[in-house]
Amino acid sequence: MAKKAADVQKGGGFLIEDVTYDQMYTPEDFTDEHKMIAKTTEDYIEQDVLPHIDDIENHQFEHSVRLLKKAGELGLLGADVPEEYGGLGLDKISSALITEKFSRAGSFSLSYGAHVGIGSLPIVFFGSEEQKKKYLPGLASGEKIAAYALTEPGSGSDALGAKTTAVLNEAGTHYVLTGEKQWITNSAFADVFVVYAKVDGDKFSAFIVEKEFPGVSTGPEEKKMGIKGSSTRTLILDQAEVPKENLLGEIGKGHVIAFNILNIGRYKLAVGTIGASKRVIELSAAYANQRRQFKTPIAGFSLTQEKIGTMASRLYAMESSVYRTVGLFEDNMSQFTAEDLKDGRQIAKSIAEYAIECSLNKVFGSETLDYIVDEGVQIHGGYGFMQEYEVERAYRDSRINRIFEGTNEINRLIVPSTFLKKALKGELPLFEKAQSLQEELMMLMPEEPGSGVLEQEKYIVKQAKKIALFAAGLAAQKYGKAIDREQEILVNVADIVSNVYAMESAVLRTEKAIAAQGAEKAAQKVLYTEIFVQEAFNEIEAHAKESLIAMEEGDSLRMMLSALRKLTRVTPKNVIQKKREAAAGIFEAEKYTV
């Protein structure tokens, strides 16, 4: 249903607005069509991909190419490609579900993700009509495989520092590209590369480069810690001849494409961590049930229950946050006509509105998965260190996610800087909110949360938002334009905001479930929410305290810490018991349950 612009939540608006559960999309809102698409993908992964995972891990890439073509036949490569160019033109929820299900396929999910995401979407969103007609049907069918070439040996996070050059030849027919691109996923078998280079040495631009163009080659396979079943090579451009019409977008506007595609890559990465996390919990619960020590299944030990309870509660918050964000994309796009959305740039712009949420999801998702795989190995004990057990590969494969799509450090810094830009543009009244909060804090008498289900959690979310504004406002006031040099404080603020978004997402999802089916049927969700909110609030307090200590001293510090104590004063719940209760349902089902 179309929404008016006034009803669509602004990116970052969650920090200053009271959001209600009926404004949030949740996994419980999946339609029958969504579930059918998810089941189709799941069946394909189980029946076609998993039997060949070991071969793929050993670089038998002919399986990767064949399986991508099979995915194309099923329509799984064309979810984000409009129907007029051979795709399915599905909504973003469907696309996200396909990505989540693919993530069970280990390294192969990287081959899929690089193809349908960063490899194809630059053409979907920014390609000319001729480029779309030429390339998208083959990319949607799997006849052609795509790759994305941005990183260079000397430019990782600083993408605009690229050294690859593009010079128009004397005939004016071809750009001549010279340089090297590093760590290019799918490079062993990709047919089409989206490549960034500087026209005349200074105009950062994007090009569509085919592997058969003169001067295009790849180096040997990289030897990696994880994701061994994905192809990673250097793309070598030795005076590569690229037709003039293969310029993607405008000269000097490559950064617009790169940064928009990074936003998409970030949220898709977060979606992938959901499926990977579910798989590790599944493996860990099943192992804990069958592994006996001291004549008892280790699932019966409370420390194992603590691990599973924590893993699942973090996953619940992550899953809630990610699908909330995808729902925001849909809401934002619903205000446009079908004709408007034929312009892919409009879709990219709709997603870019939520750059903050994309970065938050990327960081929170990758670090949650890292925590889950680490504990998964621990539950497996020595067997978790052995390659014959799937959790060993999951542990190695997880680590790259904190580096992909902009390091987590860069993404953390993006959060406060984007908030600041929105405030300066008048898009979010952050300064006004922070100022009124500081005045309020000097007189604030601690409130008392209600005693009903989730009342304390809703109160904590409200207080956590105040803490975020308190810390951010104080930092902006103290450092002004020099705030970008205080990276530790900026990262603390980002972590506070990240926990706020995750907590609120979990609370709203559970509140929505209670409204739909009652508290008893939502009992597992309530447990996850209570556990996560309390532990995240403890982290928020620690981040805020560390920042205040760095910014203030003496009487001023004591006054600020006193204000913080007013905001964090709640009676803790018994999360040890709640984790035991949450784990019981997971061990019974031998999978993540809600």
From Swiss-Prot:
InterPro entries: Acyl-CoA-dh-like_C, Acyl-CoA_DH_CS, Acyl-CoA_Oxase/DH_mid-dom, Acyl-CoA_Oxase/DH_mid-dom_sf, AcylCo_DH-like_C, AcylCo_DH/oxidase_C, AcylCoA_DH/ox_N, AcylCoA_DH/ox_N_sf
Record's keyword terms, sorted: FAD, Fatty acid metabolism, Flavoprotein, Lipid degradation, Lipid metabolism, Oxidoreductase
Active site: E405
A GO term, aspect molecular function: acyl-CoA dehydrogenase activity
Plastid recorded as keyword: no
Purpose: Involved in the degradation of long-chain fatty acids.
Name of this protein: Probable acyl-CoA dehydrogenase
